[in-house]
């Protein structure tokens, strides 16, 4: 997974994620928007066959605590990782219960 930083300020971050699509970016966007310090999060894929998604994050002005957009991205990635682990655990439990029927 290659990531290229396209723009970085104290309030904004724009990155390009090579080889990803709507599936990953949609999950990332949702996790970012659950952060109260994030004003806007979105992504754009200019052409689904030849373009990489560009993810954009803008933080709220006067946010407390002061958080950088890269910190919000790191926290969103950690949240996605935890949710994936919880999903796997729940799936394994459900499959085991199904087999015992």
Where are these regions (language model features)?
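Protein-protein interaction/assembly regions in multi-subunit complexes
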Residues: 1-101
